[in-house]
Amino acid sequence: MEKLQYELQGYLEIDRYRKQRFLYPLLFREYIYALAHDHGLNSSIFYEPTENLGYDNDNKSSSLIVKRLITRLHQQNHLIISVNDSRFVGPNRSFYSQTISEGFAGIMEIPFSMRLVPSLERIAKYQNLRSIHSIFPFLEDKLSHLYYVSDILIPHPIHLEILLQTLRTRIRDAPSLHLLRCFLHEHHNWNSLITPKKSTSIFSKENQRLFLFLYNSHVYECESVLVFLRKQSSHLRSISSLAFLERTHFYGKIKHLVVAPRNDSQRTLPLWFFKEPLMHYVRYQGKSIMASRCTNLLMKKWKYYLVNFWQCHFHLWSQPGGIHINELSNHSFYFLGYLSGVRLMPWVIRSQMLENSFMIDTAIKRFDTIVPIFPLIGSLVKAKFCNVSGYPISKSVWADSSDSDIIARFGWICRNLSHYHSGSSKKHSLCRIKYILRLSCARTLARKHKSTVRVICKRLGSKLLEEFLTEEQEIVSFIFRGTRLRSERIWYLDIIRINGLVPHS
């Protein structure tokens, strides 16, 4: 793989690429398809890893098919091979389509990777930023001091031509963009690429990498104006004394303070400014969150600006209710499988002054994250682990597998859900999900052996329970003793994608 990357780097450094920025000749290079197949060039930075569908298990056979594909590309008058071509009809037709699309995706990623990877390498421990859980510590630190939150659903493009037009600002190679357009037009269902929920689309599985690249490029352009305005906008709050500053995590926030000099007539006290950005913004896939300390009127102006910007520049029509504005104090928003919000926690502080003591009632804001039980049960119903009432049922399609395989599958799902939802402040709903999965596993084994759940549990004993325990539970139990384990939030920095059972849209 290092040899392939070295060869690719050598091609990119030649004068012809520097002057003309041609990318399409890479379609005739065999190592491009090897990199696309192996997800090289750190491609996981741009999107989540996907399954390699349609490839032969035999690498030699796959390599031979790629060589035949390149040979036929040389023999064509144009690079795009029609789906009606009789020479490409057969068991390899799906592979050819997928290979070309992944080759296109890998080539189009080159300009982005050359700019992004060096900038990330300058950031210490930038790998941690890839974790989905890295968003929540940011929200935990910021949202407790903000007033309004806006849920934004980024609209899908109405036509693929809009996606291709957005690439022109990032990729200067016009022939490559023209070839990409021709390739997409060769497929009858090419417009269905913009709706990934359609399983009948030819892009739904085979060409998922190309779809993700185009969609992420579209989202990047839609939010680019937000990032620009976010950097340009900030407001300063004048505070006459340091005592008015919030004492929570004071030493961590002291770096955000600046002292503004006064004129000669105002030398009594310095002016303290709290350098706070006007807007905080986070996003995952097509769902984004904006939060601010500004007024409701200003939030509505942001909403009006976004809707008009998308309509004028991208011809995107925001869905009714695509942008919701709510107060953080009395509203919770659903994001990345968590129901998040800010709630007031009552505190009683005892103050001692000489011989007198006082009890002071106060309240502090805390960022709260819980796991909603009904969306998770809905996902389990779709996966046929339980019915609509949450009653566990057997997984009949797994009944033909071995006992160890059945237990391992259920245990793997349970551990992944526990690992992802470790940041919940209330673990009661997660315990119910674990109970459903354990009982569904027992019912599946009972169905296989034509027995009862009680007999299966008695025969397997602790083996059935140990498979559902996570290593994190054993380690964390040494850190948080007693009941604190149920209320402590733990964020992991190794989660780069959401479990399939977690509803996040």
UniProtKB/Swiss-Prot annotation:
InterPro entries: Domain_X, Maturase_MatK, Maturase_MatK_N. GO terms for molecular function: RNA binding. It comes from the Eukaryota. Transmembrane segments: none annotated. Coiled coil: none annotated. GO terms for biological process: mRNA processing; RNA splicing; tRNA processing. Keywords: Chloroplast, mRNA processing, Plastid, RNA-binding, tRNA processing. Pfam families: Intron_maturas2 (PF01348), MatK_N (PF01824). GO terms for cellular component: chloroplast. It is found in: Plastid, Chloroplast. Usually encoded in the trnK tRNA gene intron. Probably assists in splicing its own and other chloroplast group II introns. Belongs to the intron maturase 2 family. MatK subfamily. This is Maturase K. It comes from Nuphar advena (Common spatterdock).
